[in-house]
Amino acid sequence: MCLQIRQSRFFESGLYVDSETLVEKARVFFSGREDSMNILISLGLVVLGFALLVKGADFFVDGASGIASRFGIPQLVIGLTIVAMGTSLPEAAVSITAAFKGSAGITIGNIVGSNILNVSIILGLASVIIPIAVQKSTVKYEMPFMMAVTLLLVLLGMDGKISRLDGAILWACFLLYLYYIYRMTKNGKEEQAADALPLAKSVLFVLLGAVGVVLGSDFAVDGASELARIFGMSERFIGLTIVALGTSLPELVTSVSAARKGNADIAIGNIVGSNLFNILFVVGTSSLIIPVPFNPRFIVDGLMALVVGLVLWFCVRKNYQLTRKHGIILLILYVFYFLYLCTF
C-alpha cells in the first residue's frame, strides 16, 4: 500500500517521463540543434558567396581588361564595357542564378534593393564623410535617365512578369545608354592606357574570376534561400536586404574609400551608372534568358527606388553638391523603408 502511494506521488510530481514524451523531447532538442546548424551553414554560404563574388569580379575585370589591351582594343571601349559591367557583375551573377533556380524574389529584389541601397546608404554615408561634388551632365541627363528607367521597370512588371520582350526593351535602352556614354567620353579627355598584364596572367585571372563569380552566386543564392525558409521570411525580403547589401559591397567600399581620400566627386557618377546597368543589363539579360515573375509588392519597392532617385536629384539640382545634411536625409529615408519592409 505504501509502495503504491509512493508510486502515485512520483507520477503526479512530473518527474516521471514516459517513453513517448522522452522521444518527443529528444526530437525537439535535436531539431533545434539541426536548425541552428542550418542557420550557421546558410550564413557561411552567404558570406563565402559574397567574398567569392567580390574577388571574382575584380579578377575577371582585371584579366579581361588585360586581354583586351593585348589585342589592341581601345581603352575607351574597355572602360565602357568590361570595367563598367564589372561593377554590376555580382548583381548579374546572383540575379541570373536566382532566375534559373526559380527564386524570382531574389532576382528582382537584389536589383531593386541594390539600387535603393546604392543611393540612400552608400551615397548617404559617403556624403556624411565629405560633401560630394556632382557633374552637371550627371544631374541634367544621367539622373533623369536613371529615374525614367526605374519607372520603366515598374511599368513593365505590372503584368506580373518581366518577359523576354520586356528584356529586349531594356537591352535596347542599354545600348542607347552605351552610345550616350561613348559620345560623352569621346568629347572628354581619353585616359592613358595602363600597363597591361601579361597575356597568360590575364587568362588565368579571367578563369579564376569566372569560377569565383559562378560559385559565389550559387552559394549566395542557396544560402539566402535557406535563410528565408528557416526564418519564415520571403525571398523578396532577403533579396531586398541581405543579398542587395552583399552585391553592393564593391560600390560601398569604392565610394566610401573615395570620399575618405577626397575623391568623392566620382562617387555619384559611379552609383548612377551602376543603377542603370543593374536594371538595363542585369534585369534585361536575366529576362531574355528566362522570363522573371514580378511580385506586385515589387511595384512599391520600385517606386521607392524612384523616390530615392528623385530626392537625390532634388538635393543636387541647384548647387551640384551632395552635402552632409543631404546624406542624413538619404540615410533616414532608408531607415523608414527598412521599417516598411519589416512591417509588410
What are these regions, as identified by a protein language model?
Residues 9, 21-344:
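Hydrophobic alpha-helical segments, chiefly the membrane-spanning helices
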